[in-house]
Amino acid sequence: ATRYHLTFKELYAFSRWGQSCTTGLFEKGGREFVFVPGDTVILGWESFVQGMDKANQEELADIFAEIEYEGSAEEFLRQGMTPVRQVTIAPMFVGRKLEEIGWESVPMNDPRITAHPDWLENLQKWAGQNSQSFEIHETVRFERNGDSWRAWLCHPMTYPEFQRSLLWELAASLPTPDEWAYLCGGGCRTLFPWGDGLDHKMKLHHFENGEDQGKPYDMEQPNFFGLSIAYDPYKRELVDGKTLTTCGGDGGCNVCGGMGPLLGYLPCSPHRKPEVREDNEIHNGYDVFRPV
């Protein structure tokens, strides 16, 4: 911890979905880190351990009928999963929360804001419609904060530029895809850390109902390592790769495509194949990171 200039806060016991870990919480520059012990684990997925409940089976059957798929559920799911393998993961300090990339919080009277009266004119229009936020794509974002507004300026970055800035500014890096799978699933053999399907009692992003108001989002709560990870398929978490590589989400493709909760959240499985992109352009609204 001293080597990375981390300040020890406390020991804490995390427990979730049948796995638990007592470990140290640390702080650096306003960020919370947790010490994740290493382990030798099995990663990847090829078949059900518990099997799906009736609700998940019916949801899949409806989609199979729609796309005229005649194979088994396991065959269908296996196509998008990494192969089963044994991996040894080294211990690491891990940022507890997902963070946005390329957004700089600035005061409303920042000269870079006031130099654009058209932004403020548009903001006034939106404010009049009782809107909570207003964004100009990859340029600026405003969010209501009580009676006032907060502003962020966007600084688009490429994947290599971001990796360099992470190293220089935080002395940190991105987790590898295998490390990410371990942080997310802890070596679980089921499709998700809690079982072989979606628990429909959970409050999920993009599938809320009236009864959920005021409740926390279940998947966003700290897992057995104390991490908030893979809880929103619209968020793609950057991992280490030769070109831009992400885990934990698909930018909302399945949800937006009307595939329903189960397939919508499948990209959040710890076993899902990482998405490798050729362009190296970070999409500020969707791509997020955690330092390790």
Segments predicted by a language model, with ranges:
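Alpha-helix capping/hinge segments and adjacent helical runs
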Residues: 240-282
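Extended beta-strand/loop cores of jelly-roll/beta-sandwich
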Residues: 1-174, 280-292
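Glycine-rich loops and low-complexity Gly/Arg-rich segments
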Residues: 59-62, 117-122, 198-201, 261-264, ...
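Surface-exposed beta-strand edges and their flanking turn/coil or helix-capping segments
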Residues: 47-51, 56-58, 107-109, 189, ...
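Functional-site microenvironments in short loops/helix caps that host divalent-cation chemistry
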Residues: 141-258
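Context-gated lysine
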Residues: 9, 28, 54, 97, ...
